[in-house]
Amino acid sequence: MQTSPLLTQLMEALRCLPGVGPKSAQRMAFTLLQRDRSGGMRLAQALTRAMSEIGHCADCRTFTEQEKCNICTNPRRQENGQICVVESPADIHAIEQTGQFSGRYFVLMGHLSPLDGIGPDDIGLDRLEQRLAAEPLKEIILATNPTVEGEATANYIAELCAQYGVDASRIAHGVPVGGELEMVDGTTLSHSLAGRHKMTF
């Protein structure tokens, strides 16, 4: 069936979203064009602004329009002396919803994966090491995902912390092994944070 080139382009663009296949993309495109053109325009404007204006926080690497995010510039968070290391900005959102953590974060934007050529510098561990050396930190909470790669990353960071005399702890495994942190419910995540344990080498 022949379709409008612009419609085809729209459907192909929508497929860049996770979990969106050809049928879902077609349904989304038709819905926007048939029933909600104003919503489609708002979506286009929001996407354009987000893609051009949102960058990474200079300290924690999460998404922000500012040089530093609101969490990193909060004096109370700075005095806390704790940094929670996570794999993605979505993990920060999940932890913040529990209300159980009052420190700052560091976002790896991934995890160590030697088979894929992803080493320490590729996930910002050189920058984390700079913070370990420069800031009076009390504890690094390792909240990487409970996967093989996440555990390897946590162990690497714990060894790094030991070199600088900073305590490293791992969140408890109330989080299901093999799961993604952003998909865990708030109660389970609260128990995981409360039950974290110290990692020693």
Swiss-Prot record:
Residues 81-176 form the Toprim domain. Transmembrane segments: none annotated. One of its GO terms (biological process) is DNA recombination. A zinc finger (C4-type) spans 57-72. Keywords: DNA damage, DNA recombination, DNA repair, Metal-binding, Zinc, Zinc-finger. Belongs to the RecR family. May play a role in DNA repair. It seems to be involved in an RecBC-independent recombinational process of DNA repair. It may act with RecF and RecO. NCBIfam families: recR. This is Recombination protein RecR. The gene is recR.
